[in-house]
Regions:
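Terminal accessory carbohydrate-recognition/targeting modules of carbohydrate-active enzymes
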Residues: 1-285, 329, 333, 447, ...
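A short structural micro-motif
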Residues: 159, 339-343, 387-391, 429-430, ...
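Aromatic-rich carbohydrate-recognition surfaces in CAZymes
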Residues: 170, 178, 185, 234, ...
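Extended amphipathic alpha-helical segments enriched in small hydrophobics
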Residues: 398-425, 446-449, 455-473, 478
C-alpha cells in the first residue's frame, strides 16, 4: 500500500526556471538590458547575453567557484538562487542593481571582492571572499562607514547572474537560513525580522511592513524569496557565511578570518612563487591581480579556466597550466599533472569534462618540466607520456603535432632514447601563421586578443604592449575579463563573465616581455615603455629553461644599469635587453652592465595610473 500511495501521490508540477515578473527587483544584467533597449515594457530575455560580467572568488585548490556580479549579487547555487543585498535609509530602500553610485574593487589584488555604495554621507562596503574553517565558506560582510545608521537586507532571490532560478522553500531558524532544506546562510547575530514573498509577490515591496512574524515560506511555482533585515549602526559590520558543503555549525562566524587576512594569504602565495617590482600603472595592477586570480583556475586535481562557458579548445587548458608553471606555481601544476596521469584510460587517453586533454596535458607537462626541472615528476609521467603518444598517433586532432614534439622532449629528458628515436621519425613540423587575426566587429573575442598579445611578445614587443593596453582597457575594475565583450558597452556578451583563459594569456604575455627563454639567448626587458623611463624595475625568481631568472635596472642619469642572475644558468649564457639597449649582449649567468643612454621613445603603449613612485633597487638575496 505504501508503494501505491507514493505512486498515486499528487506530484508538484515541474516549472521551468524563469525570471520573476518584471515588477520585481531584478539582477544587474536585466537592469542593463532595460537601459540598453530603453523600453521598460519589453520583457527581458530569460538568459543573460547582454551583460555577462562577474568576478570569481573561491578557495585555493577547491572546486567551488562563486560568481559576484558588478553590484554584489552572489550566485551561490547556479540555476537555483542567489544572495542580494539592499540598504534602508529613512524608510527608503536602495537596490545596488538599480543604483548608479556603485563601484567595485579587489582587496590588494586578491579574490576578495568589495562592492561600495555611496549613501548617507559615507560608504557602505559589501565584501565577499572564501575561507576554510573545518569546511569551506563564502564570507559575506557589510560595513557601515556612512554617517548614519542603516538597515541592511540580505535577500534570497530565485535567479542568478545568468538567468532564472528556482526556490521552493525558505526557512529561518534563529541565526540559520535554509533554502530547499539546505543551510544557506549563517548569520553573525540574530536577524531583526524576516520578510517573505510568494505567489508572485516580491518581498522588496514589503520591507517597511513590521507586522510580519513569518519564519518560513513555501512556493510551489519556485518563486520563493525571503529577506532578513538587521540594523547596521555607524561603524559596525554585519558578518555572515554561506556554507559550501553540509554543515550546521552556527558558531563558525567568530572563527572566520578577516578579509585582510585572506587577501594577505593570496598575496603571499603569489610572492612566494616569484616577485615583481614594476612602475605603478594599470598594467602593473592587472598583472599583480591576475597572478593571484590565476590560481582560481585550479581545482586541485584539474583546471577549470572558464566556469560558465562552453568548452572551447583543450589547448586552452594547456595554456592555463603553462601560465601556472611560468608564474612559479610549481606544486599546483605538479598535483594537476599527477591527477591527470592517474585518470589515463587503457587506451592512453585522458579526458576532462568529456573532452580529450591528452595532448594538452603533454604540452603543459613539457613546459612545466622545462622551466622547473623535476626528475621524479618526469619519470612518474614517462609512462603516461608513452601511452598518450600511442593514443595521439592513433587519434590525431588539431594540436597533435605540437603535443608529439612535447612528448619527444619529455622522453629525451627521462632517457627513454629508443622511444624518443622511434617517435622522432614520425614527427610532423609545426607551421604557425605569422599573426593572429582578431575579429573587428563590436563583439570582441577577448581570449583571442590575449592569445595574440602573447604571440606578439616574441616577435614584436611594442605591438604586444599595444595589445596589452587594449586588453587592459577591457578589464573590469576587479581585474577580470569576459570571454567576449561588446567594445562599445565594455560588457560581456558571451562565454564566461570572468574567463581565466584571458587571465592566463595576459600573465604569459607580460612574463614573456619580462623574461623570454624562447630562443637560444635569454631576453629580458623586451620593451621599455616611456612611463618606465628613469624608474627602477625588479624581477625575482621567474622560472625559465635556463634557470630561475632575476634581474633589476638602476638608473645613473640617463643610463640604465642592468643586473642579472640566473640560478644554475650555463656559463656561456647570452643575455640581451632590447627594450633598453638593442646593442647590448651580456654573457654568463650573472653580471652587471651599464647600458647606453636611453631616451623616451614615444611608444604609444599604455596610459599609467595617477600613482607615483619608483621601485627600490638592491641585490637578489
Amino acid at each position: 500500500m505504501t508503494i501505491l500511495r507514493q505512486f498515486f501521490r499528487p506530484r508538484r508540477p515541474q516549472v521551468r526556471r524563469q525570471l520573476p515578473p518584471s515588477h520585481w527587483v531584478q539582477p544587474w544584467w536585466v537592469e542593463r538590458y532595460k537601459e540598453q533597449i530603453k523600453n521598460q515594457k519589453l520583457e527581458p530575455p530569460q538568459s543573460n547575453n547582454v551583460a555577462r560580467s562577474w568576478t570569481l572568488t573561491g578557495n585555493l585548490d577547491s572546486s567551488h567557484r562563486i560568481a559576484v556580479d558588478p553590484r554584489g549579487l552572489i550566485t551561490v547555487k547556479p540555476g537555483s538562487w542567489s544572495l542580494d543585498w539592499w540598504l534602508g535609509v529613512d524608510q527608503t530602500w536602495l537596490y545596488p542593481a538599480q543604483h548608479g553610485s556603485v563601484r567595485q574593487r579587489l582587496v590588494d589584488g586578491a579574490p576578495v571582492v568589495e562592492t561600495v555604495i555611496r549613501v548617507a554621507g559615507g560608504d557602505v562596503i559589501h565584501r565577499v571572499y572564501a575561507a576554510r574553517v573545518d569546511g569551506e565558506y563564502i564570507v559575506v560582510e557589510v560595513e557601515n562607514r556612512a554617517s548614519r545608521p542603516l538597515a541592511l537586507a540580505l535577500a534570497v532571490r530565485p535567479y542568478d547572474h545568468l538567468g532564472g532560478g528556482r526556490v521552493d522553500q525558505i526557512e529561518l531558524n534563529d541565526r540559520t537560513l535554509s533554502v530547499d532544506g539546505d543551510v544557506a546562510l549563517i548569520c553573525g547575530r540574530s536577524p531583526g525580522r524576516l520578510v517573505v514573498g510568494t505567489g508572485g509577490v516580491d518581498p522588496a515591496s514589503l520591507l517597511n511592513q513590521t507586522a510580519s512574524t513569518d519564519r518560513s515560506i513555501t512556493c510551489e511555482t519556485g518563486m520563493a524569496s525571503a529577506v532578513i533585515i538587521v540594523p547596521l549602526v555607524h561603524g559596525s559590520t554585519f558578518r555572515s557565511a554561506v556554507p559550501l558543503g553540509y554543515t550546521n555549525d552556527a558558531q563558525v562566524i567568530p572563527k572566520l578570518p578577516s578579509a585582510q587576512q585572506v587577501a594577505s594569504g593570496w598575496g603571499k602565495h603569489a610572492v612566494s612563487a616569484c616577485r615583481f617590482v614594476l612602475p605603478p600603472g594599470l598594467i602593473n595592477d592587472l598583472f599583480d591581480a591576475s597572478r593571484q586570480s590565476l590560481l582560481l583556475a585550479s581545482t586541485g586535481k584539474d583546471v577549470e579556466p572558464a566556469p560558465g562557458a562552453p568548452p572551447r579548445e583543450s589547448t586552452d587548458g594547456a595554456a592555463t597550466l603553462m601560465a601556472l608553471a611560468e608564474a612559479g606555481y610549481r606544486t599546483t601544476v605538479r598535483e594537476i599533472l599527477i591527477s591527470r596521469a592517474k585518470r589515463q584510460d587503457r587506451l592512453g587517453a585522458v579526458t576532462h569534462r568529456n573532452q580529450d586533454v591528452t595532448g594538452a596535458t603533454v604540452i603543459a607537462a613539457d613546459r612545466a618540466l622545462e622551466v622547473a626541472p623535476d626528475p621524479s615528476l618526469a619519470h612518474a609521467l614517462s609512462e603516461f607520456v608513452a601511452d598518450g603518444t600511442r593514443w595521439m598517433l592513433a587519434n590525431p586532432v588539431d594540436g597533435t603535432a605540437e603535443a608529439l614534439i612535447a612528448a619527444h622532449k619529455i622522453l629525451v629528458r627521462v632517457g627513454a632514447e629508443k622511444a624518443a628515436r622511434e617517435l622522432s621519425n614520425l614527427l610532423i613540423p609545426i607551421v604557425k601563421s605569422d599573426e593572429t587575426t582578431i575579429e573587428q566587429d563590436e563583439n570582441l573575442d577577448v581570449v583571442e586578443l590575449a592569445r595574440s598579445a602573447f604571440e606578439l611578445a616574441a616577435t614584436d614587443p611594442p605591438e604586444a604592449w599595444r595589445s596589452l593596453e587594449k586588453l587592459a582597457s577591457l578589464a573590469s575594475p576587479t581585474s577580470s575579463w569576459p570571454s567576449r565583450v561588446n567594445s562599445n558597452t565594455r560588457r560581456g556578451t558571451g562565454g564566461a563573465g570572468h574567463d581565466l583563459r584571458v587571465t592566463a594569456w595576459f600573465v604569459r604575455a607580460v612574463l614573456r616581455l619580462l623574461v623570454d627563454d624562447k630562443d637560444e639567448c635569454l631576453r629580458v626587458a623586451a620593451v621599455w615603455p616611456d612611463q618606465w623611463h628613469a624608474q627602477g624595475v625588479e624581477v625575482h625568481q621567474v622560472p625559465s629553461r635556463f634557470g630561475a631568472v632575476s634581474w633589476a635596472v638602476r638608473w645613473h642619469g640617463d643610463r640604465p644599469a642592468l643586473l642579472w642572475e640566473v640560478e644554475g644558468g650555463p656559463s656561456d649564457l647570452m643575455v640581451i635587453a632590447p627594450g633598453l639597449d638593442s646593442t647590448f649582449q651580456g654573457e654568463g649567468p650573472m653580471g652587471e652592465q651599464l647600458l647606453a643612454p636611453a631616451a623616451p621613445q614615444n611608444h604609444d603603449v599604455w596610459a599609467p595610473s595617477d600613482q607615483g613612485g619608483t621601485s627600490s633597487s638592491g641585490s637578489f638575496s
